[in-house]
UniProtKB/Swiss-Prot annotation:
It comes from Neisseria meningitidis serogroup B (strain ATCC BAA-335 / MC58). Acts as a chaperone. One of its GO terms (molecular function) is heat shock protein binding. PROSITE patterns: HSP70_1 (PS00297), HSP70_2 (PS00329), HSP70_3 (PS01036). Residues 608-642 are annotated as: Disordered. Signal peptide: none annotated. The keyword Magnesium does not apply. PANTHER family: HEAT SHOCK PROTEIN 70KDA. This is Chaperone protein DnaK.
Length: 642
């Protein structure tokens, strides 16, 4: 059976896990780390860096280094949250032809799913390296409060990366899965999963029930904010530093892309340090310069100051907790365990706020960075048929419906309905002899249609002429286990039907996705070629170094013709290494190896002779030592004092 990997595709960091025979393991990436920064860098020559290597070069390549792409996924350029991010991001966010928010790097226009696919591809490669086999299937997690557009876009990202996404599951649900399966007891419990990640916040109330040895995870309610996370906490600190520096020096660092990137790194580091210490210092020499010369930034930040800067963000996370509890029909006293997930939940002030609201200490035995990937891996093993002791009942986070007369939204599926689910309702025409209707699909909680998220629209035509209110048009909403919506409309009189799978949403057409899949495959081939070229170059340079050293030591023992032949081969190999032709490098390396064979034999013979001489010298020294030994008689002396 094909293995299904679990991927937590995070805003700031991503994580990969696999579950086999009931045992889960977090898989390390190529750099040996258990989490991978969700950072992608596009270089001049077309090379793409992902993770730590991309993060390391961000300061010198700020405009082409993309982070937090997940905040843009499934969003329109005009969305107020996107407009807010444009002001703080050092890279360029643009409006795509379809109105979506895309990114421009190295002159190329890139969609968020395309960018996220690079992170997923790195995860896929790490899994293949660990398992020693090809991996094509995955379970990918998304914030519980992601809407249909964002879920579809995440699925598209997986497809571009060469992965068949078997299931999209909610991050808090995955974390609860990891927590519940780790507990050996059979106790039924209600848990609150507070998930404050890099870019999004979710709260889910989940009931874990034991059913004859199997565990059922039922999501009772979920709520959240897809634009609240660690990135916002970082930004508050960055804004504070910029304001203080402007007061002192009169220079606005917001206009300096390189300075902004350095500030981002420093703010993230300071934030982490303030989780364990009471004060930290930010030192950024040569942050900028003016007519008087270079300027240095040195500033002390206390934990109390940082907490005051982000107090309202922490308060903002508590409101969805209240709504989720109310929707679940529970009070804080009904919650058995509070689980913290997401890196930002490590902040002491966040933990204090959660404890104050729920009236109990959050659990510390769940790894906030890895739990989501572990849960996804467990679900992956369930889907591959590897285990059957887990049943997951998730919900749709937002209500779904259509626009009806008067510009109102009529809901067909209420929020927090367990999925998969299906609902139908009969509607009619608003005008006499109306021959077509437009089905406008919406997602959200507002009564006014325009205040909700538009997921797409389609037409049902050829309706038989009839007075208004007479034709019967049945609209059916069908949500699959991924939380992705399929809508159909049928004229009950004529039997004519039309349907739509809400895809617009990732903004990508089938043709665009296919092109991006091909681009990603081409990139993978390019990466492979680059790796092979670097390996050949390293091999050649190692041989060049070795031959040069041997020539310096033993060149005078070679005849002139032999030495000339080696020097010529050496020169050709050095020239080949400067180029990008792998075949030429390999050929010249082989030629140098053949030309320097006699020199190599000479070096080997000399090394053997030296080794034998060393052994002989050691034997003589040992014999001399034996000759110097004096035989002696020993007599035991008894101590009378004892």
């Amino acid at each position: 059976m094909a293995k299904v990997i679990g991927i937590d595709l995070g805003t700031t960091n991503s994580c990969l896990a696999i579950s086999e025979n009931g045992q889960t393991k977090v898989i390390e990436n190529a750099e040996g780390a258990r989490t991978t920064p969700s950072v992608i860098a596009y270089l001049d020559g077309g090379e793409i860096l992902v993770g730590a290597p991309a993060k390391r070069q961000a300061v010198t390549n700020a405009k082409n280094t993309i982070y937090a792409a997940k905040r843009l996924i499934g969003h329109k350029f005009e969305d107020k949250e996107v407009q807010r991010d444009i002001e703080s991001m050092p890279f360029e966010i643009i409006k795509a032809n379809n109105g979506d928010a895309w990114v421009k790097a190295q002159g190329k226009e890139l969609s968020p799913p395309q960018i996220s696919a690079e992170v997923l591809r790195k995860m896929k490669e790490a899994a293949e390296a660990y398992l020693g086999e090809k991996v094509t299937e995955a379970v990918i997690t998304v914030p519980a409060y992601f809407n249909d557009s964002q879920r579809q876009a995440t699925k598209d990202a997986g497809r571009i990366a060469g992965l068949d996404v078997k299931r999209i599951i909610n991050e808090p649900t995955a974390a609860a899965l990891a927590f519940g399966m780790d507990k050996g007891d059979n106790k039924d419990r209600k848990v609150a999963v507070y998930d404050l990640g890099g870019g999004t916040f979710d709260i889910s109330i989940i009931e874990i029930a034991n059913l004859d040895g199997d565990k059922q995870f039922e999501v009772l309610a979920t709520n959240g904010d897809t634009f609240l996370g660690g990135e916002d906490f970082d930004q508050r600190l960055i804004d504070h530093i910029i304001a203080e520096f402007k007061k002192e020096q009169g220079i606005d660092l917001k206009q300096d892309v390189m300075a902004l990137q350095r500030l981002k790194e420093a703010a993230e580091k300071a934030k982490i340090e303030l989780s364990s210490g009471q004060q930290t210092e930010i030192n950024l020499p040569y942050i900028t310069m003016d007519a008087t010369g270079p300027k240095h930034l040195a500033m002390k930040i206390t934990r109390a100051k940082f907490e005051s800067l982000v107090e309202d963000l922490i308060t903002r996370s508590i409101e969805p907790c209240k709504i989720a509890l109310k929707d679940a029909g529970l009070s804080t006293g009904d919650i058995d365990d509070v689980i913290l997930v997401g890196g930002q939940s490590r902040m002491p002030k966040v933990q204090e706020a959660v404890k104050a609201f729920f009236g109990k200490e959050p659990r510390k035995d769940v790894n906030p960075d890895e739990a989501v990937a572990v849960g996804a891996a467990i679900q992956g093993e369930v889907l591959s048929g590897g285990r059957s002791d887990v049943l997951l009942l998730d919900v749709t986070p937002l209500s779904l419906g259509i626009e009806t007369m008067g510009g109102v939204m009529t809901k067909l599926i209420q929020k927090n309905t367990t999925i998969p689910t299906k609902a139908s309702q009969v509607f009619s025409t608003a005008e006499d002899n109306q021959s077509a209707v437009t089905i406008h699909v919406l997602q959200g909680e507002r009564e006014r249609a325009s205040a909700n998220k538009s997921l797409g629209q389609f037409n049902l035509g050829d309706i038989a002429p009839a007075p208004r209110g007479m034709p019967q048009i049945e609209v059916t909403f069908d949500i699959d286990a991924n939380g992705i919506l399929h809508v159909s409309a049928k004229d009950k009189g004529t039997g004519k039907a039309a349907n739509i799978t809400i895809q617009g949403s990732s903004g990508l057409s089938e043709e665009e996705i296919e092109r991006m899949v091909k681009d990603a495959e081409a990139n993978a081939e390019e990466d492979k070629k680059l790796t092979e070229l670097v390996a050949s170059r390293n091999q050649a340079e190692a041989l060049i170094h070795s031959v040069k050293k041997s020539l310096a030591d033993y060149g005078d023992k070679l005849d002139a013709a032999e030495k000339e032949k080696i020097e010529a081969a050496l020169k050709e190999a050095e020239e080949a290494v400067k180029g990008d032709d792998k075949a030429a490098i390999d050929a010249k390396t082989e030629a140098l190896g053949a030309a320097s064979q006699k020199l190599g034999e000479m070096v080997y013979a000399q090394a053997q002779a030296e080794a034998q001489a060393g052994e002989s010298e050691q034997a003589n020294a040992s014999a001399k030592k034996d000759d110097d030994v004096v035989d002696a008689d020993f007599e035991e002396v008894k101590d009378d004092k004892k």
